[in-house]
């Protein structure tokens, strides 16, 4: 994976002439998890260098797919993905490779609280994985979602040349409106990832580990009763690593590039 290049003109054309003419249900057709995105079937995901992309830079965008947040994946595919990518590329990120994930609630017995795409460089393949996300639309009344599943997968099931060759951390962004699940139960990791661990994993400890190779951020939809959730996120991640977005997500096209560009280190031969 990771071949091809991103064409913002072609992507923008598809957004306006294809995706914007469709309903959310027509774009996101999945009625269950796509087998290619099922973490139980995935041993490892890789972001690798190639002759075409010698300085790969991994970016994970993990989207809350529960009932209150389905408008954000829709917004990204219909409106803002070309703007996000164009901003990143124009700012000098040479070889961005983007993975989309879907995040739900593993405490509410969702079918697919974690869905994992591939790292891609081309517009068509990024769109392929984004539209494969199953918008399960559930989530419970427990006031949190299982965002740490994205951290766990990145920490245990992703390898990148950016880190192994250049000690360049990737960027991992979760987007949602709930608080963060405090503990991943070992039974949940077994059920949804086929990973057998000896004990439950405290999310704050997991965060310490994943931060060794990833710059971790959260973009928070901060409307109404969800304002308290942002405070919880700030206590966990730290000030400046949690960014509030408009309820309609209209400013996400500016927020995501800003976070990414703040972490990117240009190759030495480009400086």
List each language-model region with its residue ranges.
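Acidic, polar low-complexity linker/tail segments
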Residues: 6-60, 67-74, 78, 86
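Surface-exposed acidic, glycine-flexible loop patches that form ligand/cofactor-binding
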Residues: 48-53, 89-92, 156-167
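Von Willebrand factor
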Residues: 52-116, 121-169
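DG-centered beta-turn motif at the end of beta-strands
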Residues: 63-65, 151, 169-181, 185-188
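Extended, composition-driven regions rather than compact fold-specific motifs
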Residues: 111, 159-162, 181, 185
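VWA/integrin I-like adhesion module and closely mimicked acidic/polar interface patches used
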Residues: 178-231
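C-terminal helix of von Willebrand factor
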Residues: 222, 236-271
